[in-house]
């Protein structure tokens, strides 16, 4: 999504980028069901600590995003649902890459 890319690009050039994690998740599978479950969706993680250029195929759910945010911020789970959610460890690395993000231009005429 062009708008999301531009937002991440701007934020990655800010002084806050070294301590930032951005999660982008669709609220539904947009075009509807296809040959796979319509309950699945995509989640994008942008951070100096995010693994760049990889597709993580680990099955997470929306509560996993919340659980990951709680762990990053060092706060306890709010309830049993986020306490039992799988944290998104596969999306991150211990070594930060502070290179700013560059949004791709639109290729739709």
Residue ranges: model-predicted function:
Residues 1-109:
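N-terminal pro-sequences and low-complexity stem/linker regions of secreted or lumenal proteins
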């Amino acid at each position: 999504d062009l708008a999301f890319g531009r937002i991440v690009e701007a934020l990655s050039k800010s002084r806050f980028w070294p301590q930032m994690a951005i999660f982008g998740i669709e609220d539904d599978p947009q075009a509807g069901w296809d040959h796979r479950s319509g309950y699945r969706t995509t989640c994008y993680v942008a951070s100096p600590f995010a693994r760049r250029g990889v597709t993580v195929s680990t099955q997470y759910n929306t509560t996993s995003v919340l659980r990951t945010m709680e762990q990053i911020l060092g706060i306890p789970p709010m309830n049993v649902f986020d306490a039992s959610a799988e944290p998104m460890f596969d999306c991150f690395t211990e070594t930060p890459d502070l290179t700013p993000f560059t949004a791709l231009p639109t290729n739709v005429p």
